[in-house]
């Protein structure tokens, strides 16, 4: 029997950061991973706001299969439809809350609920800040159920030069959770040692300049008020 391609469900919701969902689909397509996409109505609104140059049909074309968020009878709503898991990118607090309570409101939360009951991998790229206690409790509840809450917090040790590099690194780390190698991650190799040098002693006039009175301009810093 021929080995089936890796299959993932991708959910896109109305939280800011739709670029994560778009880039995720692009990378998975390049990796020849079978993707099943469902984007909520709020997600479609966010797509139009944040990525106006990308038409909805073009986003759909990145996926292997696309479902309406109201299609509760879709294949991905059943546990018998085998997948490696699901990634919600980005994940809104509303979607997080629906998953935490098990009261599913659309196909995104229903598919996520199925992933949890089948003990498959669910990754939620939660995009919200600051968080109140209810959000934190929902995060704890889905974690106890087996989900992985993965806020897309950028890494700075690779010293990214552009937002695209931050997005790529984050997507690469998320796909690490599914053992999908993308080549997008700058792997940490340990702290680089710097040659020990004795700090230069400041000159007397520099010491004097460092201490200014309120209202005066400090030549080594911003105006003190």
Predicted regions and their residues:
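A cross-family phosphate/adenosyl-ligand binding-site feature
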Residues: 1-123, 129-225
């Amino acid at each position: 029997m021929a080995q089936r391609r890796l299959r993932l469900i991708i959910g896109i919701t109305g939280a800011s950061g739709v670029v994560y969902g778009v880039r995720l689909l692009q990378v998975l397509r390049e990796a020849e991973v079978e993707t099943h996409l469902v984007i909520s109505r709020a997600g479609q609104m966010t797509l139009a706001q944040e990525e106006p140059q990308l038409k909805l049909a073009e986003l759909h074309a990145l996926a292997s299969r696309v479902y309406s968020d109201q299609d509760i009878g879709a294949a991905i709503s059943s546990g018998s439809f085998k997948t490696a898991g699901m990634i919600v990118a980005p994940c809104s607090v509303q979607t997080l809350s629906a998953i935490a309570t098990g009261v599913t409101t659309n196909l995104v939360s229903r598919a996520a609920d199925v992933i949890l009951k089948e003990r498959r991998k669910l990754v939620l790229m939660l995009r919200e800040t600051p968080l109140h206690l209810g959000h934190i409790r929902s995060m704890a509840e889905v974690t106890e159920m087996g989900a992985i809450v993965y806020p897309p917090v950028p890494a700075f040790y690779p010293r990214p030069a552009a937002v695209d590099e931050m997005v790529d690194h984050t997507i690469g780390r998320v796909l690490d959770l599914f053992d999908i190698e993308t080549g997008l991650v700058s792997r940490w190799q340990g702290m680089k040692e710097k040659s020990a040098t004795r700090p230069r002693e400041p000159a007397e006039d520099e010491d004097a300049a460092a201490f200014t009175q309120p209202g005066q301009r400090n030549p080594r810093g911003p105006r003190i008020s």
